[in-house]
Amino acid sequence: TGSANGGSGTYGIYLSEDEGVTWTFQCCGNQPAGPPSLTNINMMGWDKEGEDDGGQYYYDVGLAVDPVNPQKLHLGGVNHWVSTDAGATWVCPAKWSEPGEIGYVHADIHDIRFFGTELWIACDGGIFMSNDGGTNMDKSQVGIEGTDFWGFGASPQSDVMLGGAYHNGTLLKDNDTYINDWICTGGGDGVRGFVNFGNDRIAYDDYEGRILSGDRTMNINGFQFDSLPNASYIFGESSTMEWDPRNN
């Protein structure tokens, strides 16, 4: 269980061995809730050790029991957590920001399911699958065209587009410059992009301006610009940039 308001962190892990008639507190700490620590970990937060406060219980949470070994549990919040003692203790194999680590799963897990002995995890980064109980997690989304742009801009003169694929970075298409058409210009929670109306070599995303090189062997340089007043970050609201034809 967790708190969907206030701290939005882990409240407790409970176990039932009589089909839900009674429940026993398993984790974490000596009692439900309380401040996070090494002995009272918060699995809804961002920290691999579970010592940070808060989290996203209102947004991402998943839980599954291994069909071969009922003592082994998989829990998803921001990170993927594993227990081998029916929920008494937990470890995070790889933090959301450690894509090179064994067992890595993208941040913000929404569902965890077993199909036979295959473990499947759905998250903001797509779908991950394991056929060894979760030790190794592989991205399993080849052929799925599921990139979701929250916002993007395009040049009226050329085939240049820049858009934010929320939680999957900011993506750029610069004519036919890049292999497979698109390149990621930045990670994180990109939600928009703009291409200068009068000069398609200049673009803007959530973090900075971009000077497009037009050559995949050359870097895309960035520059700072005044982002205040800010474009809205709230779902359902719209923000845009307008160009002064006298100076664009």
What kind of region is each of these model predictions?
Residues 1-248:
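Beta-propeller blade termini and top-face loops
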